[in-house]
Amino acid sequence: MTRTLLKIYTLFILLLCRQRDANRKLLVFLIDGFRHDYMDDLHNLPGFREIVENGVKVDYLTPDFPSLSYPNYYSLMTGRHCEVHQMTGNYMWDTDTQKEFLIGTNPDSRLPMWWDGSEPLWVTMQKLGKKVYMYYWPGCEVTILGVRPTFCEEYVYNPSEKNLTDSMENALNALKSSKADMAGIYYEKIDVEGHHFGPRSPEIQRAIRSLDQAFQILNQKIREKNMRDTINVVLFSDHGMTQLKWMEKIIELDNYINMSHIIKMMDRGPVVSLWPKQDKFEEIYQNLSTADNMNVYKKHEIPDRFHYKNGQFVSTLTLVAEPGWFITENKAKLPFWNNGTEAAGGWQHGWHGYDNEFVDMRGSFLAQGPDFKSNYRAGPIRTVDVYNVLCKTLGMNPLPNNGSWSRVECMMRSSAATAGASLISCCFLLLLTLTGVC
C-alpha cells in the first residue's frame, strides 16, 4: 500500500511540474520609438542591465517599411509585412468608401476594414480559449475578426509613468492568478520625447532613465511574486528616431505642383500618399520627380524590398523623403511650438518613417525568462520575426507569416534543455518531500 501511494505521489509531483511548464505566462512591452542605441549606456541603466544579463539582447530590430507606428504594431503581432496585413500607414484612405484612418484617433479608425487584413496574436489566443489583458495597446479596443481581448485598458495619448507601473502590477497579478495567459503593455513617452526634443536630447535621456526605473520595479516585483521561472518577459519597439532640423530640410510640394490637382493627400513627413486627378497624373509625377531629396514612386514602381506596394490602401503616388527631410504641402501650414513666453520654435526635432534600412530607424528587442538564454547577445532581427518568438513562448503554432525562425532560434533555450532543468527541479522537490524536509 505504501509503495502504491509513493508511486501515485511521484506521478502527482511530475504532473504538477509538467503543468507548471505548460502554464508559463508571457508579458510583452511595446516601447514606442525606442531606438536601438538608447540603452548603450547599460552601466547607468540598472533595470535594463538586469534584463540583458539575465536574458537576450539583439543588436537591433529592423522595422517594416514604412518605419511608422501602426504598420509595425501590426507586423510585430502578425509576423507579416505591411502589404500582407494591410495596415500600411498611420494615415490611410480607402478610395471605395472614402473613409479615413487617422493614426487611430477618429471613429472610422475602428472599422474592421483596416484591421481584418490579418489576425494578430491576441485574437488567435482568444479564439483558442486563452486570456489576454492589454494596457493602452493601440487596437485592443477594436473588434478584429469578431474578437476582442479579455481585458483592454484603452489607449490614451502618452500614458504616464504611473500608468506604466500600475499596468505592470496589474498585469503581473493577472498572470500569476491565471486570469491572463498573456499581458501586453504599451508605452509612448519615449516616442513623444524623441519627436519633441530629438533622439539625443536631455529630455530623451531623462525619459529613458525614468523607464529604466520602472523596469527596476518590474524586476523586483517578479522576484517578490516568485515568478522568475514561470514568466517570459519580452520588450520591443516599433522603430527608431532620427534628428529633424525643423524648417531647414523641407520639401514643399506646392513648389512643384498645383495642389488643386490632388484628390487626396495623406500624412506629411518622410512618406506621403497622393492620389492625383487621373488627367493630371503624369504631369504631377513628372514635376515631382524633379524635386531633390525625395523619391517619387508610381504604385507598381515601389521597390519590392519595401513589401509595401501590394497594400490595399497604398496610394497611386508614394513620396519617400531622404533621411532628415520632411515633405509637406507648404511651410506656412506647419505648426510651431510656442509657450507664449519665448520665440516660436520647431514643433518637432525628431522623426521616423524613412527607409526602414536607414540605421536610425532601427529598434530594440530584449527578452528574459525560462524560455530564453541568459546573458546572450543575438544578431539583428526584423519586426516580422518577433511574432514567431512570442508564439514559441506560448506553445502555439504560428499562423503563416513572413518572419524567419532561423534569425531568432538562437536566442531560445532548447526544448531539451528546458525540460531537463524542469525535471531536475522536480526530482529535487520529490527528494526533499520523501526525506521529510518539506
From Swiss-Prot:
Signal peptide residue numbers: 1-22
Domain of life: Eukaryota
GO biological process, one term: choline metabolic process
CDD domains named among the record's database cross-references: Enpp
Membrane-topology descriptor: Lipid-anchor; GPI-anchor
This protein's record includes keyword Oxidoreductase: no
Lipid-conjugated positions (GPI-anchor amidated serine): S415
Cofactor-binding details, from the entry: Binds 2 Zn(2+) ions per subunit.
Cystine connections: C140-C152
Residue sites binding Zn(2+) 2 per the record: D191, H195, H352
Cofactor: Zn(2+)
Localization: Cell membrane
Keywords: Cell membrane, Coiled coil, Disulfide bond, Glycoprotein, GPI-anchor, Hydrolase, Lipid degradation, Lipid metabolism, Lipoprotein, Membrane, Metal-binding, Phosphoprotein, Signal, Zinc
Entry protein name: Glycerophosphocholine cholinephosphodiesterase ENPP6
Organism of provenance: Danio rerio
Phylogenetic placement of the source organism: Eukaryota, Metazoa, Chordata, Craniata, Vertebrata
Gene: enpp6
